[in-house]
Amino acid sequence: MVIKVFLASSSSFVTIKKRQQEVLQFLEANRIEYEEVDITMLEEMRQWMYKNIPKDRLPGQGNPLPPQIFNDNAYCGDYESFFESKESNTVFLFLQLKARPAQKEL
């Protein structure tokens, strides 16, 4: 299972760039395997992302903004959901992954 982070490499919004960076840094720091999917370069992936976000999770207006997070083809959530799971220490549950036991640094 690979976490897919749908992002926009050419976004002019600083907030979106910071949120994307925060998600990727968290995944790297926790050694969670992930794949970046750039929706600005691949129209078919943008359409796939829109189609696979559950209707009840779509914004009231407009299109869903990146980053959007999937575990393979299963939708996990957007940045706000990711942030909430980070704050409540439930990120592995949010990402639909088994929690890893804490490892002691040598």
UniProtKB/Swiss-Prot annotation:
One Pfam family recorded for the sequence: SH3BGR
SUPFAM superfamilies registered for this protein in UniProt: Thioredoxin-like
Principal subcellular localisation of the protein: nucleus
A GO CC annotation given for this chain: nucleus
Keywords: Nucleus, SH3-binding
Keyword Nucleus among UniProt keywords: yes
Sequence motif SH3-binding, location on chain: 61-67
UniProt key word Nucleus: yes
Subcellular localization(s) per the UniProt record: Nucleus
Entries under InterPro entries matching the protein: Glut_rich_SH3-bd, SH3BGR, Thioredoxin-like_sf
Domain of life of the source: Eukaryota
GO molecular function list: SH3 domain binding
Family annotation (Gene3D superfamilies): Glutaredoxin
Family: Belongs to the SH3BGR family.
Protein's UniProt name: SH3 domain-binding glutamic acid-rich-like protein 2-A
Organism: Xenopus laevis (African clawed frog)
